């Protein structure tokens, strides 16, 4: 009976270790995908406010644009 318990515990530890390795590999892959690469250095998003928006803008705010790169937004 003691041998059966030890074998079961060892089998459980091996299964948990394999599962942890798989999770670590997925986490490493996700982290590698989130890091900015050399090819997306120049990628930018530009947002403009449509003229028919619900809230009217003052004359000084008309034509305001936002340029976002790498999580940093600048108003143009």
Curated annotation (Swiss-Prot):
Cross-link Cyclopeptide (Arg-Cys) (interchain with C-73 in subunit B), sequence positions: 65
Name this polypeptide is given: Rhesus theta defensin-1/2 subunit B
Native source organism of the sequence: Macaca mulatta (Rhesus macaque)
Domain of life: Eukaryota
PTM remark: Forms a cyclic peptide with 1 subunit B (RTD-2) or with 1 subunit A (RTD-1). An additional intersubunit disulfide bond is formed.
Disulfide-bonded cysteines: 68-73
Signal peptide stretch: 1-22
Additional comment: RTD-1 is 10-fold more present in cells than RTD-2.
Quaternary context: RTD-1 is a cyclic heterodimer composed of subunits A and B; disulfide-linked. RTD-2 is a cyclic homodimer composed of two subunits B; disulfide-linked.
Family of the protein in this entry: Belongs to the alpha-defensin family. Theta subfamily.
Tissue: RTD-1 is expressed in bone marrow. Detected in promyelocytes, myelocytes and mature neutrophils and monocytes.
Cross-link (Cyclopeptide (Cys-Arg) (interchain with R-65 in subunit A)): 73
Function: RTD-1 and RTD-2 have similar antimicrobial activities against the Gram-positive bacteria S.aureus 502A and L.monocytogenes, the Gram-negative bacterium S.typhimurium, and the fungi C.albicans 16820 and C.neoformans 271A. RTD-2 is 2-3-fold less active than RTD-1 against E.coli ML35.
Pfam families, alphabetized: Defensin_propep
UniProt region (Disordered), positions on chain: 25-54
Cross-link Cyclopeptide (Cys-Arg) (interchain with R-65 in subunit B) per UniProt, renumbered positions: 73
Ranges of Low complexity composition bias in the record: 30-44
GO cellular component: extracellular space
UniProt keyword rRNA processing present: no
An individual GO BP term: disruption of plasma membrane integrity in another organism
Cross-link (Cyclopeptide (Arg-Cys) (interchain with C-73 in subunit A)) at residue(s): 65
């Amino acid at each position: 009976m003691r041998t059966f318990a030890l074998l079961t515990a060892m089998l459980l530890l091996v299964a948990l270790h394999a599962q942890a390795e798989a999770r670590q590999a997925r986490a490493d892959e996700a982290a590698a995908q989130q890091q900015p690469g050399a090819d997306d250095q120049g990628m930018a998003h530009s947002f403009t406010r449509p003229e028919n928006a619900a809230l009217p803008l003052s004359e000084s705010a008309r034509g305001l644009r936002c340029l976002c790169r790498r999580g940093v937004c600048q108003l143009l």
